[in-house]
Structure formats: C-alpha cells, structure tokens
Regions:
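C-terminal motif of bacterial Sec signal peptides marking the signal peptidase cleavage site
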Residues: 2-6
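Bacterial signal peptide processing site
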Residues: 7-11
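N-terminal beta1-alpha1-beta2 submodule of the flavodoxin-like/Rossmannoid cofactor-binding fold
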Residues: 14-121, 131-133
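Short, conserved loop/helix-junction motifs that constitute active-site signature segments
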Residues: 116, 142-150
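Glycine-rich, N-terminal phosphate-binding loop of Rossmann-like dinucleotide-binding domains
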Residues: 126
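Charged helix-capping and loop-helix junction motifs
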Residues: 136-142
C-alpha cells in the first residue's frame, strides 16, 4: 500500500487519493547515483516531477514506480553529506537534524531545482523519521518554498511505523 496526499497551493485541507527503518525496511534512501542533483532525469511527460529522498531504497522504489507509471521527470533529493551505513549512527544524526530544524537550522543538501514552472504536479516522497518528514526533504521544501508556491503537491511516504499525517504538520 502506498499512502498519498495532495494539495493545490490553497489553504484548503489536503486532497487524500517513527523512526527511520533498518536497511531493507520501508524508509527509503540511497547510495551514489551518477546523476546531477540539480537536473531531473527527464521522462516523456514533462508535466509532472517526482522528487524523493531515500536512505534504504524503499521510497526510491515508490518514486520509480510513479515515474514509470506517469512517464515523468524524477529527481533524488540528496543530503550534502551522505548518511552513515551504521544504523545507530544514522539514528543519532537524524535526531540531531530534526532538533536543529525545530530551531530553524536546516541541514545542507546537494539538490536544487531552478524552475518548477513547467510542472503541473510535483510528487514529493520521503521516509518518515521519528514521525516527521525526512530532513533532506524538509530542507529542500524550505529552500524552494517560494518556487513551489501555488503548485499542486502530491505527497507519498514510506514508514515502518508512523502514518503520513503527522509528518506534514
């Protein structure tokens, strides 16, 4: 099952269609890919963009399924410094980053998009960490808030325990 939510930039409620998981579970993410983190991989349908961040690959697989179904552009949101493969080290870093975000300090990411003008819908996928949107995606959305204003956004998330609703408060 793939929960999704969407909104259209208005203040209306979303349209509806805990902890980071262990590798192989359902929180997404991943290693090196030789694509440029500022250029979406183009698909045949340029009206949609799938943005995602993923640590273990679960969210990435969901993003790829959407991309293949819609034949649209796709782009991975990557942290500036990759996460450790050590699970406990990753958990510590995730907790530190979430605490920093609550103080208004967002962790650095490599990914940026110059213009969303051609996209009708932007799909945003992320793992849920400690009940929250994964920090790389929080940073991306914070950095691109003005460029995304008024766009239709469709959320999808992977989680081993938490639901999507608390991750978008």
């Amino acid at each position: 099952m793939m929960p999704m939510a969407a909104c259209d930039g208005s203040n209306a409620d979303p349209i509806l269609p805990e902890q980071p998981g262990q590798p192989g579970n359902s929180d997404g993410g991943d290693e090196d890919d030789s694509t440029n983190p500022t250029n979406p991989i183009p698909g045949g349908n340029g009206r949609y963009l799938v943005l995602y961040c993923s640590r273990t690959g679960s969210t990435e697989r969901m993003a790829q399924q959407i991309q293949q179904t819609l034949d649209c552009d796709i782009l991975e949101v990557e942290p500036q410094t990759p996460y450790e493969s050590d699970y406990n080290g990753m958990l510590n870093r995730a907790q530190e980053e979430l605490a920093a975000i609550r103080q208004g300090n967002y962790p650095a990411i490599k990914t940026s998009v110059e213009d969303f003008g051609n996209y009708d819908i932007v799909f945003v996928g992320y793992p849920i960490w400690y009940g929250s949107m994964a920090t790389p995606m929080q940073t991306f959305l914070h950095n691109h808030a003005s460029k995304l204003a008024g766009k239709r956004i469709a959320l999808f998330a992977s989680s081993g325990s938490s639901g999507i609703s608390a991750s978008v408060d």
